[in-house]
Regions:
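Accessory RNA 3′-end/elbow-binding domains used by RNA modification enzymes
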Residues: 1-9, 18-35, 39, 43, ...
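Catalytic cores of RNA-modifying enzymes
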Residues: 1-169, 173-207
Length: 296
C-alpha cells in the first residue's frame, strides 16, 4: 500500500467518519489513517482519507472551504437539527418556494454562527454532544463563518427544499437550516446533506466503500488511479523546484539563505519532479515546513 497518499471516499449515510476509517484500516493494511472534515452520520459525500505520511497534510490544507447540497424540511424542529433527532416542534407550513428563495440572500457573507449542542465543539474540554445526550445545555459563543453562495435547487417532496451552499470551514448546515426556518417563521430541520466538495477534493473524484473494498481485496487499488498523491491537496500553492544542495538542506531542516523567490508558502519538488514537501520563503530565506517524501 502506498504509504503517502489520499483516498477520496463517498461516505455512505449511517456511517460516522470514524466508521469509515475503521473499515479501511483492515482493507488497506495500515492503522495510520486520518481524515479532513468530519461528516455527520446521516450525511453523505466527500470524505478525504489520508494514508500514512499523508496524514500530516490533513491539517495543512490551504483550502478548507466546503460545498454542500442540503435538503431543508419545513414544519419540523428537532433536538439534533436534523431528521435523526427527536421532534421538538411541528407546525403547518404556510410558506413555499417563493418565500424560501426570497430569504436566502440574507444568509450570504461573513457572519457569526452559534454551534449546535449536537456537535464536536469542545467547551471546557468536553464535546458538546456528550452534554446534549445527558439533556444538558451548555453556554456557547458564536463563531465566525462565511457563506459564499446559496443556490436554490428545487423541491424533491412537499415541504422539502434543496439548496447548494458554499461555505467556510466550521459552518453548520443544520444551524443554517434552522435559521432559514426562523426567517420564514416556521420550524425547520435538515432532511438530507451531501458534501460535494471539501477543499481540493470533489465528489467526482470519490469512490464508494464497496468499490474501494472490492479493489483492495482484488489487489488492484494501487493501480486504480484512485489514490491521489499528497501534493494534490496543495495544488493551489505555487511550485518551487530546488537543486540537490537545497534539497539536502531541506531534508536536514537547515535554512537556505539568499534564496531568490517571493515571500510565501510553496510546494517543493526536486530536479526529477518528485514532490518533497512544503517550505516557506521569508525575506530571502527558504525554510522547510514539512517533508512528505521519504529520503532515498
Amino acid at each position: 500500500m502506498n504509504t503517502c497518499a489520499i483516498l477520496p471516499v463517498d461516505k455512505p449515510a449511517g456511517w460516522t467518519s470514524f466508521d469509515v476509517l475503521a473499515k479501511l484500516r483492515g482493507a488497506l493494511g495500515t492503522r495510520r489513517l486520518g481524515h479532513a472534515g468530519t461528516l455527520d452520520p446521516m450525511a453523505t459525500g466527500v470524505l478525504a482519507v489520508f494514508i500514512g505520511n499523508a496524514t500530516a497534510a490533513a491539517d495543512r490544507q490551504p483550502d478548507h472551504d466546503k460545498t454542500y447540497e442540503a435538503t431543508i424540511r419545513l414544519g419540523l424542529r428537532t433536538d439534533t437539527g436534523d431528521v435523526t433527532g427527536t421532534a421538538l416542534e411541528t407546525a403547518p407550513v404556510t410558506v413555499g418556494e417563493a418565500e424560501l428563495k426570497a430569504v436566502l440572500p440574507q444568509f450570504m457573507g461573513r457572519q457569526m454562527q452559534l454551534p449546535p449542542m449536537y456537535s464536536a465543539v469542545k467547551i471546557n474540554g468536553q464535546p458538546l454532544y456528550k452534554a446534549a445526550r445527558k439533556g444538558q445545555t451548555v453556554e456557547r459563543t458564536p463563531r465566525p463563518i462565511a457563506i459564499y453562495e446559496i443556490t436554490y435547487l428545487g423541491s424533491p417532496a412537499p415541504g422539502d427544499y434543496t439548496i447548494r451552499v458554499s461555505c467556510s470551514k466550521g459552518t453548520y448546515i443544520r444551524v443554517l437550516a434552522e435559521d432559514i426556518g426562523t426567517a420564514l417563521g416556521v420550524p425547520a430541520t435538515l432532511a438530507a446533506l451531501r458534501r460535494t466538495r471539501a477543499g481540493a477534493f470533489k465528489i467526482e473524484e470519490c469512490h464508494t466503500l464497496p468499490e474501494i473494498l472490492a479493489a483492495a481485496e482484488a489487489g488492484t487499488l494501487q493501480q486504480s488511479g484512485w489514490l491521489l498523491p499528497v501534493e494534490h491537496v496543495f495544488a493551489s500553492l505555487p511550485a518551487l523546484t530546488v537543486d540537490d544542495a537545497v534539497k539536502k538542506h531541506l531534508f536536514n531542516g537547515c535554512p537556505t539563505s539568499h534564496y531568490r523567490a517571493q515571500d510565501g508558502k510553496y510546494r517543493v519538488y526536486d530536479a526529477a519532479g518528485t514532490f518533497l514537501g512544503l517550505a516557506n520563503v521569508t525575506q530571502g530565506v527558504l525554510q522547510v515546513e514539512k517533508i512528505f517524501c521519504e529520503r532515498a
